[in-house]
Amino acid sequence: MPRLVLASAPAKIILFGEHSVVYGKPAIASAIDLRTYVRAEFNDSGNIKIEAHDIKTPGLIVSFSEDKIYFETDYGKAAEVLSYVRHAIELVLEEADKRTGVSVSITSQIPVGAGLGSSAAVAVATIGAVSKLLDLELSKEEIAKMGHKVELLVQGASSGIDPTVSAIGGFLYYKQGEFEHLPFVELPIVVGYTGSSGSTKELVAMVRRRYEEMPELIEPILESMGKLVDKAKEVIISKLDEEEKFLKLGELMNINHGLLDALGVSTKKLSELVYAARTAGAIGAKLTGAGGGGCMYALAPGKQREVATAIKIAGGTPMITRISKEGLRIEEVRE
């Protein structure tokens, strides 16, 4: 049995189809190469101990025993991550039918609350690290299902997109609860974070209100978004060369952003980052996720640095990254 395991899992972006997916339309999501790292090892206390050094918020150390939670420090949003980690560890211990002290230490490149799936990534990386520590053989699909279960326990509702993308990696086409893996395309992207986040629940409710008040206007927008996702899928699986794929996907990104703007989920800051990216040479740029803040992303072959600079000048936090073919990764095992 190993004495220490280090695992990592990637963030995700919704490439196409946010909001319309709520109405039964498809969406395409992908893993991106921003990662959360979880180190797991045994401890002698018999408790679960979580150290969160860097979740893009100040660190904290928390110990759980059967009936008490010990907070050594307490800083804002970092605390939100703890429920995911605790449930992830407990599910693995339950699956392995073991009760032992486990310490996990978390470091992350993924900002919390930015719509990039930070909660799913930490849950998946924790399940991967702790299951390996306990010599429990789980497939990536099984880990994705456990990650989905963690989200249900913490959030009460979840489509399962985030943990599935984080565990398995690459591109995922999602429609009404069913997943389909798409061929891998290397997309050079830049993610821009506005520094604030909107409430997914409130934004979904706002779109629902508009849909109920003006179905004759909103239904065609949602219908167009669904068709756009299927068009993007066609491009991804086509035999077109890389440059042609980029051009077509970029055009679809720009249309998708316009449709999301028409639904009312973009913000002044998101649009500023989107247009700054396009002006700097991005082929396409759009918001990703619920909107109301959070992130946008730009497709910028050969122009990632220029686009990142433009996003920074426009007041955003740029992250140069790429689509991650790999999902969950075991980085290190010490016997």
UniProtKB/Swiss-Prot annotation:
Catalytic activity of the protein: (R)-mevalonate + ATP = (R)-5-phosphomevalonate + ADP + H(+)
Compartments reported by the entry: Cytoplasm
Recorded metabolic or biological pathway in which this protein acts: Isoprenoid biosynthesis; isopentenyl diphosphate biosynthesis via mevalonate pathway; isopentenyl diphosphate from (R)-mevalonate: step 1/3
GTP-binding among keywords: no
Keywords, comma-separated and alphabetical: ATP-binding, Cytoplasm, Isoprene biosynthesis, Kinase, Lipid biosynthesis, Lipid metabolism, Magnesium, Nucleotide-binding, Transferase
GO molecular function annotations of the record: ATP binding; magnesium ion binding; mevalonate kinase activity
Top-level division of the source organism's lineage: Archaea
Known EC number: 2.7.1.36
Enzyme class: transferase
Short name of one Pfam family: GHMP_kinases_N
HAMAP family documented for this protein: Mevalonate_kinase
Subunit structure: Homodimer.
UniProt function note: Catalyzes the phosphorylation of (R)-mevalonate (MVA) to (R)-mevalonate 5-phosphate (MVAP). Functions in the mevalonate (MVA) pathway leading to isopentenyl diphosphate (IPP), a key precursor for the biosynthesis of isoprenoid compounds such as archaeal membrane lipids.
PANTHER family, per the entry: MEVALONATE KINASE
Family of the protein in this entry: Belongs to the GHMP kinase family. Mevalonate kinase subfamily.
Protein name from the UniProt record: Mevalonate kinase
Gene that produces this protein: mvk
